[in-house]
C-alpha cells in the first residue's frame, strides 16, 4: 500500500486528491469558463480499489476546488474510465426545463466476473450530481475482455455522436444520434499495433499541423502496459485521418511513437468542448502506484499540456507544451553551476549544445538530465527513496528499466528545453515539446542545488501559486 514518506511530497501546482487514491483522468470537459476534472478514485483507501468518479473544477487548471464524488458503483459494476458529452441540443432528451445535459459515458466493470460494458449517466446541475440511465448498458459487451474507456465526441462528418474505446489489442468506433443507441462503425489496430499488449484509455483528436497544405491531422492516443521486455507503461499515438466511421494511420513508422519518454504519465486524454487539444495524464506509473511513499493520498495529474503537430524529417510528430502556467512563472534569471534552490517549485530554461543538469540535495541524492546533439537522458537511479520498487513483482519489469530512460531527438544540434520541478514531480519539454518526459522522484530531503556542466546556458524561474 502507499506508504507514509519521510516528508510531504504533495506538489504545489499539480492536481492531487485531497486524500486517498486517484488514477485516470475522466470526463474532461470545458464549459462556461470552468474546467471539469473527473477521475478514477477510491474514496476509502490510498490504494486501488472499487472505482468511483471523483470530481474537481478549476478556472485555470492550477487551482482546484474539490467536489463530492460524482459516480458510485452500482449493480452493473464499478465506475471505470470514460468521458463527457456536453449535449447542448438535448439530443439525449434528458433535459426537462431547457437545461443542457452533461452526459457521462463510462465503463461499468463487474469486479467478480470482469465483464465490462458501456453505460451513461446525466447531470442537469453543471456536473455535480448524476442520474444513471435506466437503459444501461448502452453498449453491451460483445464477448471480449478489456472492453473499456469510451471517449465520446461530436462527429461533424456524420452529424452524430461518435466514440472510440479500447477492445483488447485494438480500438473500436461507435456512432449514435442520442447517446443511448449505438452502432459499431469500425475498428483500428489489428495488424498495425507494434506493441503486443492490451490497449486502454483511447482518445481521438483533431490537431493542427502548422502546414498550410495539410491543415490538420487526426491523432489516436492509446495507453498500454507492456511488462517483460521493457516493463513500461506508455502512451502510444498514431497520426492519420478519420473518415467519420473509423481511423486510418497515414504515418507508417518502424517504431512506436510515444507521447512521453519518462516513466510517470499514463492514461492521458484531452478536454472536450475546447478549441484546442489540452491534455492531462495520470502522473504515476500503474506498475508501482500502489506503493509510492506519499502517505494520505496517492496519485496526481501532469500539468495541462497543449498538443500540436510538427513536421520533421521523419514525418509528423506530436509536440506538447505546458498550458495555462504562463502567469505563474516569475521572471527568469541566469544561473551558474551549483545554484542554491530556495523553493521546491521552479522551472529551468535551457539552451545549448550538450551538457548535464542535476538537481541535488545534501544527502547525495540527485536526478540528472543529460543532453547530447542527438539524445536526451533522464536518470533517477540516485534520486531518493526507491523502496516502492521492492513491492512490485519482478516478473513485471526490470528495476533498471524504470530508473534511466533515453530518447532520440527529432531536431539535432542545439537544444531548447524547459524543465519544471514541483516537489516530487519532474517534467521535461525539449525541442519545442517534441521530446517530453514525466518523472516522479522522492528525495529524502528537498533538492537544494542545481548543478550544471557542459555547453549549456541555464536560466531559472520560480513558480508562484
Annotated model-derived regions:
Residues 211-214, 239-465:
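Beta-rich accessory regions
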Amino acid at each position: 500500500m502507499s506508504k507514509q514518506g519521510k516528508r510531504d511530497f504533495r506538489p504545489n501546482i499539480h492536481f492531487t486528491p485531497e486524500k486517498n487514491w486517484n488514477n485516470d483522468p475522466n470526463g474532461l470537459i470545458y464549459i462556461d469558463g470552468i474546467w471539469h476534472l473527473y477521475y478514477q478514485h477510491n474514496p476509502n483507501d490510498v490504494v486501488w480499489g472499487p472505482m468511483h468518479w471523483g470530481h474537481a473544477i478549476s478556472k485555470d487548471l492550477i487551482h482546484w476546488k474539490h467536489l463530492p464524488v460524482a459516480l458510485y458503483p452500482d449493480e452493473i459494476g464499478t465506475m471505470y474510465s470514460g468521458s463527457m458529452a456536453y449535449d447542448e441540443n438535448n439530443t439525449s432528451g434528458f433535459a426537462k426545463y431547457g437545461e443542457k445535459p452533461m452526459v457521462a459515458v463510462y465503463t461499468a466493470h463487474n469486479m467478480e466476473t470482469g465483464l465490462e460494458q458501456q453505460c451513461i449517466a446525466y447531470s442537469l446541475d453543471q456536473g455535480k450530481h448524476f442520474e444513471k440511465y435506466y437503459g444501461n448498458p448502452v453498449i453491451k459487451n460483445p464477448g471480449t475482455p478489456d472492453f473499456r474507456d469510451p471517449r465520446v465526441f461530436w462527429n461533424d462528418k456524420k452529424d452524430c455522436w461518435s466514440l472510440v474505446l479500447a477492445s483488447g489489442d485494438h480500438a473500436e468506433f461507435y456512432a449514435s444520434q442520442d447517446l443511448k443507441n449505438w452502432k459499431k462503425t469500425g475498428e483500428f489496430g489489428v495488424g498495425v499495433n507494434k506493441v503486443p499488449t492490451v490497449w486502454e484509455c483511447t482518445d481521438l483528436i483533431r490537431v493542427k499541423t502548422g502546414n498550410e497544405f495539410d491543415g490538420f491531422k487526426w491523432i489516436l492516443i492509446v495507453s498500454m502496459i507492456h511488462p517483460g521486455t521493457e516493463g513500461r507503461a506508455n502512451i502510444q499515438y498514431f497520426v492519420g485521418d478519420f473518415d467519420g466511421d473509423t481511423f486510418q494511420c497515414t504515418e507508417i513508422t518502424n517504431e512506436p511513437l510515444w507521447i512521453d519518454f519518462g516513466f510517470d504519465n499514463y492514461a492521458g486524454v484531452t478536454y472536450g468542448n475546447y478549441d484546442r487539444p489540452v491534455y492531462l495524464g495520470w502522473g504515476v506509473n500503474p506498475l508501482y502506484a500502489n506503493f509510492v511513499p506519499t502517505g494520505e493520498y496517492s496519485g496526481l495529474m501532469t500539468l495541462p499540456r497543449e498538443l500540436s503537430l510538427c513536421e520533421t524529417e521523419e514525418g509528423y510528430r506530436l509536440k506538447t507544451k505546458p498550458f495555462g502556467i504562463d502567469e505563474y512563472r516569475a521572471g527568469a534569471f541566469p544561473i551558474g553551476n551549483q545554484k542554491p534552490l530556495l523553493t521546491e517549485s521552479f522551472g529551468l530554461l535551457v539552451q545549448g549544445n550538450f551538457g548535464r543538469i542535476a538537481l541535488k540535495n545534501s544527502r547525495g541524492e540527485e536526478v540528472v538530465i543529460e543532453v547530447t546533439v542527438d539524445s536526451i537522458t533522464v536518470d533517477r537511479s540516485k534520486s531518493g527513496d526507491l523502496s516502492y520498487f521492492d513491492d512490485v513483482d519482478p516478473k513485471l519489469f526490470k528495476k533498471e528499466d524504470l530508473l534511466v530512460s533515453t530518447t532520440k531527438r527529432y531536431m539535432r544540434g542545439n537544444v531548447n528545453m524547459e524543465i519544471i520541478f514541483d516537489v516530487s514531480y519532474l517534467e521535461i519539454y525539449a525541442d519545442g515539446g517534441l521530446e517530453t518526459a514525466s518523472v516522479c522522484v522522492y528525495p529524502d530531503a528537498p533538492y537544494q542545488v542545481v548543478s550544471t556542466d557542459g555547453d549549456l546556458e541555464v536560466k531559472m524561474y520560480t513558480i508562484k501559486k
